[in-house]
Amino acid sequence: MSNYHHNHNYQHRPRGYERLPGKRLPDRWNIYDNVGRDIDGTRFVPFKTPLDSSFFDGKNMPVELQFGVKTLISLAQQANKQIGLVIDLTNTDRYYKKTEWADHGVKYLKLNCPGHEVNEREDLVQDFINAVKEFVNDKENDGKLIGVHCTHGLNRTGYLICRYMIDVDNYSASDAISMFEYYRGHPMEREHYKKSLYEAERKKKYGKSSGKSSGNSADSTISSEQLHRNNSQ
């Protein structure tokens, strides 16, 4: 579903737009592909955060580098795909208006994930897993994709998608990481996230973990009521 050919020369994509007049783009946002392809064997499609059109005012950015909610919906339609749920992992509400998803009939869930530490937040992992399970178990959502994004659609996004693939779909950590990176079009950058994914696989197999996690997963649930609150506010 990507509007770019995947390659790892993304460091050479145009830079500097974040320093132009108007709202400041997120750091390094422009160097990553807007959206990956839906991951084979799953419902997931990873993408970087869409931005409100006001972020592009005064920057004279090429249209293909601008990326908003409407852009993603259009790309999905062109690929004969339908996104039914978007899970937003950014730790801010400043990038776009969440009501835009509802305007396109897409459910929206916000999980505030601080950068660099989602692997220590087992409560967020379980919230993510529960939300995805609830969505895929509803027959009304058959065939619909689940869009997942953080700021760059890479590290927090990759970690949580891979955790679902490991914990629920029984992928090995190696396969989950490789698949995510292939379909996202970029490698995960946080080595401690990758290490934590291998630890999660070991914990699932042997019931032991040498790492630490915070949060109380026993009290962590995502319900239809929470999804409703996210989409009605």
UniProtKB/Swiss-Prot annotation:
Tell me, how does this one assemble?
Interacts with the ERI/DICER complex component dcr-1. Interacts with ERI/DICER complex components rrf-3 and isoform b of eri-1. Interacts with drh-3 and rde-8.
**Which PROSITE patterns does the entry mention?**
TYR_PHOSPHATASE_1, TYR_PHOSPHATASE_2, TYR_PHOSPHATASE_DUAL
Q: Which InterPro entries match?
A: Dual-sp_phosphatase_cat-dom, mRNA_Capping_Enz/RNA_Phosphat, Prot-tyrosine_phosphatase-like, Tyr_Pase_AS, Tyr_Pase_cat, Tyr_Pase_dom, TYR_PHOSPHATASE_DUAL_dom
Please give the family membership noted in the entry: Belongs to the protein-tyrosine phosphatase family. Non-receptor class dual specificity subfamily.
Residue spans of biased composition, Polar residues class: 218-233
Chain spans, region Disordered: 1-21, 204-233
Q: Where in the cell is it found?
A: Cytoplasm; Nucleus
User: Per its record, how is this protein called by name?
Assistant: RNA/RNP complex-1-interacting phosphatase homolog
Residue ranges, compositional bias (Low complexity): 208-217
EC numbers? 3.1.3.-
Residue ranges with Basic residues bias: 1-14
